[in-house]
């Protein structure tokens, strides 16, 4: 009988989980080399098989990742590459990682498989642990440039479209995005900003007044821009 895999990917979130399995932490940053660990917990009633495999990845302008084989300059050692996870059991995975070039990043995928459904489908869940190997180079405000920052009407709301570009070789993280109007402010989730990356930001604004400014909050500085009315040709 043919069996099919139903695979669920959970990426770059603050927590990766289903009601039965969790992995934590999901994201970890290190200076230079990594010497870390993560845990996988089986909250279900069925034993699970877990297979670990590291992958390199790139991220496009909209934040969507593309995965590939681990780049040869990244070296990863895992305490285990496969194991059985019993019901209610927590399993710790220890690892060491280094890279010939910094900054660099990779993801360790835990592919979790259990039983089959009544229709013969074998379910698999992929849980990510993402690792960033960073250097000591700090991003400064002059290395971040606004490409555009606009707002336009979108039904009963307004849509904000902005682009920001990292002109450096440093990795950084936008911790928070703030949009303000004459009488209000809204906060939005941040995102990682990779070396040389141009990042598209699309937000829905539901305030009563038109948005006027957008602000990106980094660890040690803020980057602001006025919001212009989008051209009707766009």
Spans of features found by a protein language model:
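Sec-dependent N-terminal signal peptides
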Residues: 4-14
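Beta-sheet-dominated interaction scaffolds and their linkers
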Residues: 20-45, 82, 140-157, 190
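Primarily extracytoplasmic ectodomains and periplasmic/lumenal surface modules that are beta-strand-rich
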Residues: 36, 42-49, 55-60, 101-102
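Asparagine-centered strand-capping/turn motif at beta-strand->loop junctions
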Residues: 40-44, 162-168
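Short, hydrophobic/aromatic beta-strand segments
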Residues: 46-54, 63-64, 107, 171-177
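Terminal connector regions
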Residues: 55, 98-143, 208-234
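Intrinsically disordered, low-complexity Pro/Gly/Ser/Thr-rich segments with frequent PxxP/GP/PP motifs
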Residues: 68-101, 183-210
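Structured core of small recognition/catalytic domains
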Residues: 171-232
